[in-house]
């Protein structure tokens, strides 16, 4: 299923020097976002920086949202993870997409202009409405919390 999403190019290098975000394979869930920097940027250990992607999206459909997620190799190989763990893009947001990068590693890491640094995934949204109750119906789990089911 394909859903049209409005895309605004904020950096003229997108679509010329660097491709528009796209799915790499028919089974891809995310589209890569690129570091649209003016110069290469070295992120020191422990440092967090905000990186422009050069695009904005308007999802428009309230039954959808977008999330910015890490690329697996960045965190595993280089210690570069998202500073906010997941970026949530509400359907009515129209501003620039930025990626918060945190170097949790022990070595400086240099992002180069146009590097793929995160991925954009569109997800369904259910807006819940709370129903106030005094007690919950009994469930098998009940109030069992962290670690209650063990590890084996």
Swiss-Prot record:
One matching Pfam family: dUTPase
InterPro entries referenced in this protein's UniProt entry, alphabetically: dUTPase, dUTPase-like, dUTPase-like_sf, dUTPase_trimeric
EC code: 3.6.1.23
UniProt catalytic activity: dUTP + H2O = dUMP + diphosphate + H(+)
Keywords for the protein's UniProt record, in alphabetical order: Hydrolase, Magnesium, Metal-binding, Nucleotide metabolism
Transmembrane segments: none
Enzyme class per UniProt: hydrolase
Pathways involved: Pyrimidine metabolism; dUMP biosynthesis; dUMP from dCTP (dUTP route): step 2/2
A GO biological-process term: dUTP catabolic process
Claim: Hydrolase is one of the keywords in the record: yes
Residues bound to substrate: 71-73, 84, 88-90, 98
Cofactor annotation: Mg(2+)
Gene Ontology terms for molecular function: dUTP diphosphatase activity; magnesium ion binding
Stated family: Belongs to the dUTPase family.
Known function: This enzyme is involved in nucleotide metabolism: it produces dUMP, the immediate precursor of thymidine nucleotides and it decreases the intracellular concentration of dUTP so that uracil cannot be incorporated into DNA.
Name assigned to this protein: Deoxyuridine 5'-triphosphate nucleotidohydrolase
């Amino acid at each position: 299923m394909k859903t049209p999403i409005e895309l605004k190019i904020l950096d003229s290098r997108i679509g010329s020097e660097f491709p528009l975000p796209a799915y790499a394979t028919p089974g891809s869930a995310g589209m890569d976002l690129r570091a649209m920097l003016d110069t290469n940027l070295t992120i020191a250990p422990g440092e967090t920086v905000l990186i422009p992607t050069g695009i904005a999206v308007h999802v428009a459909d309230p039954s959808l949202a977008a999330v910015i997620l890490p690329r697996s190799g960045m965190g595993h190989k280089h210690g570069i993870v998202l500073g906010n763990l997941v970026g949530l893009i509400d359907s009515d947001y129209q501003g620039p997409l930025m990626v918060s990068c945190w170097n949790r590693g022990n070595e400086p890491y240099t992002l180069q202009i146009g590097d793929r640094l995160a991925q954009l995934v569109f997800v369904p949204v259910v807006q819940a409405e709370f129903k106030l109750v005094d007690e919950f119906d009994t469930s098998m789990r009940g109030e069992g919390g962290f670690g209650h089911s063990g590890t084996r």
